Structures are given as structure tokens and as C-alpha cells.
Amino acid sequence: MKLSWLEAAALTAASVVSADELAFSPPFYPSPWANGQGEWAEAYQRAVAIVSQMTLDEKVNLTTGTGWELEKCVGQTGGVPRLNIGGMCLQDSPLGIRDSDYNSAFPAGVNVAATWDKNLAYLRGQAMGQEFSDKGIDVQLGPAAGPLGRSPDGGRNWEGFSPDPALTGVLFAETIKGIQDAGVVATAKHYILNEQEHFRQVAEAAGYGFNISDTISSNVDDKTIHEMYLWPFADAVRAGVGAIMCSYNQINNSYGCQNSYTLNKLLKAELGFQGFVMSDWGAHHSGVGSALAGLDMSMPGDITFDSATSFWGTNLTIAVLNGTVPQWRVDDMAVRIMAAYYKVGRDRLYQPPNFSSWTRDEYGFKYFYPQEGPYEKVNHFVNVQRNHSEVIRKLGADSTVLLKNNNALPLTGKERKVAILGEDAGSNSYGANGCSDRGCDNGTLAMAWGSGTAEFPYLVTPEQAIQAEVLKHKGSVYAITDNWALSQVETLAKQASVSLVFVNSDAGEGYISVDGNEGDRNNLTLWKNGDNLIKAAANNCNNTIVVIHSVGPVLVDEWYDHPNVTAILWAGLPGQESGNSLADVLYGRVNPGAKSPFTWGKTREAYGDYLVRELNNGNGAPQDDFSEGVFIDYRGFDKRNETPIYEFGHGLSYTTFNYSGLHIQVLNASSNAQVATETGAAPTFGQVGNASDYVYPEGLTRISKFIYPWLNSTDLKASSGDPYYGVDTAEHVPEGATDGSPQPVLPAGGGSGGNPRLYDELIRVSVTVKNTGRVAGDAVPQLYVSLGGPNEPKVVLRKFDRLTLKPSEETVWTTTLTRRDLSNWDVAAQDWVITSYPKKVHVGSSSRQLPLHAALPKVQ
């Protein structure tokens, strides 16, 4: 027997849900239309005013990419020249501009998470936004909160932040604010449950020898999707994000870019998202179906790259003309796109792209792939870096986690002989950008691989920075960057005052395989003989310091407690200032204050939550059952009584801190926001007209492979090229999908990020934090809540901050808990509720160092 979504979800309170019980994604129609609520009001009105002047083909032009490698950006829509609206330029990545030049390479999202610093997250976002804007880019394809990081070996975890939804949500939102305050539309991606690279695309899987009919399905219950994977996207919507990218995977066997439950219900009806949903590149699988399910923009426009075919473009024009897609739906798409454009002030900053993603040549054809159009200047070589190296260097240092320190750090600079050991300390012999999309692990790891990358303007290696430091102090420094030269390593380590050993572990996007790792990591071990390299040094030098550059946790059990391993640092993926950032920490110019954004287990088995690496459904879509529910990372370790080597939130400092004086105060806060019980009717703007209004303009020189909105003739069937044109829509259009009448507002909806009551501040918590050491440093107070239910995690992170304190200085850190912070998702009520179970608050320096705790008073 297959259960309904709600029945299956309800079972998770007491049991594990089977694959069959999660095999269905319930329909939700019609697609909610934007209404300009909250901070969107002005942008919405401007969007309505301009869209009201557009013809149908002009609206369609905004919704459909012009094709892969046709124009300068990785994605570009058509424009509306008649109204002085250029095509939108969309460009990767979450850590800087991909396929460009004279831009910065920022630290990855996982490093931002390690800072636990809201202000730094904002400043990084703002700096990236400035660079994108200066290059003529309208939409940055980032940041990412999907993957969240369900499995530690997931290939693209590093593009996001942390497997904790609260930590991710806060830093996700701050990044978005920074990008959009710089005048660029941010894209929250990949929505949703995009937690592994294996089987994410049919053609990609075929390249690795797997014959599947459809992409992997992430099968999840209603409670888990709300409390874990949707949580950071709610923060993004509340922050005003302009765009959301839907993902390649299926959710409960319905594709992410045509899943009416996740797009229409969760995103637009519950969270009140007012911006536009774009497809990931190649994630668009239908025309009418995706339009009615809530997709607003097709990227890059063609069905497969350079196929000259599109589910939208001409076919979307036809679908509106023949009534299959109602006018209000395409109007809503256009309004959402233009509202996002106006909200960030892009109209004031707009300029055409001044670079080409496809060539570094100064001159070339305007339309790259077909080599057609005017021959013109395509690269203007605009330097957009400003002074961003400063925030990059600071973020790199402030994200370096001191995992272990037996009084070995900081270095004094007086060390007579310094050994630098490991390939990860040095340069890529091919050059910093020598591997396309960073698809190799040569030299120091400062950025992982895939589309989520940027070109380095330069890369300061650890070897370069440390050598400069040692020579400044008249010492001696030697480097061995061959991880297999163990005999030479042993000899040098015996002579050294300190041995700095550099190791790494890489991962990335599934279209690139590095050393047999097809995007996802094959394991959590160090790459390139790293464990043996460390042991060779530690067995011969009593002051061995290990530096790890990695995309996530690695297994350190073989050597972390070696008596000669005196310190361990995790530096993540620190970007272009890698060596300088590290030297700042090693030599004490920066006191490390970072905290691990994930758990370091003793074994891979300790994490559970294995990736699906082999077919498990014949040649059908592989099935990935999220049967662990909300118990990932530290939540799972706590549930299974697994003792980690380093817990979530752990990180040492060159000073010490004390936490005391926990105080709790109930607040009489209540939202004054009036939430309507029903929406208005779906608005329409302008007239549709007739087929004769939308045939190709006379005299137009068509560009090969370019995706246009026009018709070849007034014969809609002939223009569509669809052999199934004319089938009975009653059999294929879901019930209610075209209904533009007023709709009920969901109990969990009614505002940006959900019902405004969720954000009522119910309890104030204050704690005294004191620097008890002899140097200034950063404390990161962490507040966790026990929600009390018998099947809830032991604790869940809810609040945090990063505080700089001088020696002996103390401060009172105050934060508030909202209704959302204290609630669980009720699958029967389809709403957030504060349960009657007793709740506690815990405060300390990590998920397992929580000296302060108290019962919370009951609130509603």
C-alpha cells in the first residue's frame, strides 16, 4: 500500500519511511501569482507597469534563454528593445565570476560557514556583487544552500555552507543581501534536495556507463523537507532573494523544475516568494507542465545544448495563443523577472556584458557558437577587483579552524629551520587556472572544481607566503612538494624546528572526474598519500603542524593524536589569498576564531547517509531515500551516541573564553501583520492578440541555433513542430492548473519566508562572555535548543554570533528566539506549531561544549 504524502510524513515521528511510501509528490495548483507583498511593493508596481506595455512575444523573450554559447554569458535571455530593456546576463558562480578575467577568486561558501560571521558573509556577497555588476552581469548564479550537506562526501557541499540549516540560512541570507545591495540579482540554488552528483543527469550518467531513463529521485517526508532542506530557502526568501534555481534531481519522483509541490506550494504559496524561478542548465524537461508547475525562466533556453529546439520560446507563445497556458501565467513570469530586476536597482546600473565567456580574444563574432553576426569587440578586459583582496585575505584567515594546538601556535618567527612538506603547499605546475573549471588536484587546493568556480587573478601559495615570512626573520626554509618522496621528507623533518605538512581532499561537479572521483568523493581519506606524508614527518619531527585544505571533513584518526602532531588547522578552500591568510594565522597576526561547520567523525560509517552510487531501480530513476529524516551531521552523531573526533562548532583560539550568567526573559511580542485569508484573482496585463501578430518579423536575419519567441506561420501546429500537438488537454493539464480565481492563503504562508507570526520574538536570552586569556580574540557563542519531542534531535542550533574581545574584556551577548526557532512542522495541520513538550536552551562554544543550560518557559 502506498501512503499519501501526509500519512507518510506523519509516520516519521515514530518510524522510518520506506521508498514506496515516499514515491509520490502531490500536485499543487494553480501556480501562485506575485502580489508585491512587503519590500517588493515598489518593484512589483514598476514591473506591472512595464509588463503591461509588452506584447506576448516580448514577455516570452524574457522567460527564455537564447541558447547555449550564443551570447556572451553562460545564460542570456532575450530583451525588449522597444522598451529599452536589454537581455538579462546570467553568470556563475557562488564564489566569483566564472569564465572571465581580471576578477577575484573568493573563498568558498564552506569557508564563510566556518567564520560564523554574519558581517563577513555580507561583505563577501557585496564584493562579489560589485564585480558582477562591473562586468555587466545582471544575475549572479549563487549563493548555494543545495546541497545542504546531507552526506559528507557530496561533491558540491563546499559551494554551500553547512549541513546545519540554521547556520546555512543566516549566512545564505547575508550573502544574498550583500550581492543585491550591490545591484545584482542573487540566485538561491539548487532548489531542492540536490544532495549528490551521481545520477543527477541522464546523459552525464551515460558517460560513466550507467543507462538510466530519468535522474535520481530524492525521496523525503514532509517534516524533514520543512525542518531541514527548506529552512535556509525560507531565510533567502525573507532576505528578498530575486531568483531561485531549481535543480536537476527529482523530488519524490517529480522533476525539480516541474514539481508543483516544491515550486507552487512550498516556495510560492508557503514562503511567499516574489521573484522568479529559473531552471538549472538542462533541468527543463517539459513545456506546458513546467510553466503550470511554477517555472518562470528556461535556461539556457534550448532543450539540449545548441539543439535549436526549446520547450519554451516559440512553443510558449503557442501555448498561450491556444489557451493551454493561461495569459496570467506568462504575465506572472514576466512580472516576477522584472520585479527582481527593479528590486536590486539593476535598471540604474545596467550595462551590456563587457566580456565573453567563450574566448579570451579581444575581437570575435557576436554570436559565438555559430560564429555569426557582426565581428566586434567581445572582451574589454575590465579589471573589477577593486580592493577585494583585503576581504578575501581576512575571510581566509577568519575561516581557518584551529582543531588542535599543543602550544605549537602561533609561531614566533624565530624558528631556525622550517620544513614545508606536501604538494598542497605549492603551485599547480599547469598554472593556477591550468585545469578547466579547476578540474584537477595539482598544487595547493584553494578552490574545488565545477561550474561553481572562478578564474584566479593570482594565487598566493602557502609555500610562497611562509617562505617570505621565514626569510623576513633570517631563518632557513626548505620545501618538498612530492607527497611520495617519503625518504626525503623523513630526512628534512629530522632537521627541522617545525614541519608544516600540507594535505588536501577535493571534490566538485559531476561533469568532471578527478582521479576517479566523479564529482562526489569516493571516500573521506586524504588524497595523494596524505596520511603517510603526515606520519613520515611526525615520526621524525616533534613539532609537526598539519594544514588541511579540503571540501569538507576528512578522516584523521590515523594521526591526529600522534604526540608529535602538535597542531592541526583546517583552511578549507580559501581563494586567491590562500597563503597570506594562512600565514596571518600561523604567525599570530590573526587569532583564529573559526568554528568547524561540520562534524569530524572517526570513520565514514559514523555519518550514515550514504550516497547512491549504483543503480537500485533497474534502468529507471535511482531512488535515494532520506530515511534518516532530520538526523544528519551532529544531529545523527548525537542520536547514535557516536563520539566524533571534532564536533560541530569546535574551534580553538590563542586565548580562552568563559561563559556565564545565562538569563531568560519572556517577551510579549506579537506580529501586527494582517495576513489575508484569500488572494486576489490572477491579474493579466495587456492583450494576447492573434497568431498573425507573432510570426517572424520581415527582414529578420535569423542566427543559427538562436531561440526566438516567434512563429514560422499562423498554423500553430506547424509552427510547434510537436508531433503530439492537439492532444486533449483535459487528459494532460492537471486539475486547477489554469484556474486564476482567488485562492486560499495557506496557514503557513502570508508573508516573505512564511507566516509573519513565525518571526515573532518570544524569548530573550543573554549570556556573559569573557576573554580569560592574554591576547585579543574572537568568541563564537552558540545557542542550541532542545525541542523536547521523543523523536527530536538532542539539540539544534538556533543562534550564534562572533564577538571580538580584548584580554579580560567581558560582554553580555543577547539574542532572541522566535516562534520559528521553537516550532516543529505539523504534517497534519500543515503548519508550524510549538509542541507541548518541555524545551531547553543550551549555550556554549560548540555542539558538545554547552556549559550553560536552562528550561524554557512555555510560550505559544
Swiss-Prot record:
This is Beta-glucosidase 1. Residues 1-19 form the signal peptide. PROSITE patterns: GLYCOSYL_HYDROL_F3. Belongs to the glycosyl hydrolase 3 family. It holds the Pfam family Glyco_hydro_3. Gene3D superfamilies: Glycoside hydrolase family 3 C-terminal domain (3.40.50.1700), Glycoside hydrolase, family 3, N-terminal domain (3.20.20.300), Immunoglobulins (2.60.40.10). The active site is at D280. It catalyses: Hydrolysis of terminal, non-reducing beta-D-glucosyl residues with release of beta-D-glucose. Keywords: Carbohydrate metabolism, Cellulose degradation, Glycoprotein, Glycosidase, Hydrolase, Polysaccharide degradation, Signal. Glycans are attached at residues 61, 211, 252, 315, 322, 354, 387, 442, 523, 542, 564, 658, 668, 690, 712. GO terms for biological process: cellulose catabolic process. One of its GO terms (molecular function) is beta-glucosidase activity. Pathway: Glycan metabolism; cellulose degradation. Its EC number is 3.2.1.21.
